[in-house]
Amino acid sequence: VEENKIYAGAGALLSKVAATALSESLTGFEFAAGIPGTLGGAVRMNAGAYGGEMKQVLESVEVMTADGEFLTIPVEEMGLAYRTSVVEQKNYIVLEAVISLEKGNPEKIKEVMDDLKEKRVTKQPLEYASAGSTFKRPEGYFAGKLIEDAGLRGFRVGDAQVSEKHCGFVINRGNASAAEIMELMRQVEDKVEENSGVRLEAEVRRIGEF
């Protein structure tokens, strides 16, 4: 930490970065406190929640290209948009990021973090394993509402299930395989399109062949 800036490696948990911000009385990173994942992943997909996004707090990112070249990219050149960035588009490897925040009241910062945590506990299926929000929000719609309107609340493929608590989440009820989760997502995408004409796009990233 240097003045209002936090320097963190790509492997740093977002919760740890948020805790550091709180301990230094820095505000602006509260939205990310409950997002499960690391700083590198958050930078790559411009992670966000509750009105906040990484593009609002990033100053610069150090990356490595496929050719082994090291680059420092300022936020203005990151191409940060809804769940994407130049890092993703060019498949760069994030090494480190500089977060620029503002001085704030630590009590107020903690209050906001606690409030957002309560919202997550109340509205999201945190009692089950999941990869978080499964589908991107289509423009003008909410993915969870489209899934619910298609009659898919609680829909299952093996141990993979559309959460009954929040239809925007696909959960693992115990022993779901990647194949089951992918099949569930495919069926959800198809059924939602049949019902509403809207084709959902996965927010989670697929790694490997399916």
Please report, for each region that a protein language model flagged, where it lies by residue.
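A glycine- and small-aliphatic-rich helix-loop capping segment at beta-alpha/alpha-beta transitions
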Residues: 20-26, 45-56
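Short polybasic amphipathic segments
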Residues: 59-63
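Phosphate/pyrophosphate- and phosphate-bearing ligand-binding catalytic cores of soluble enzymes
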Residues: 64-186, 190-210
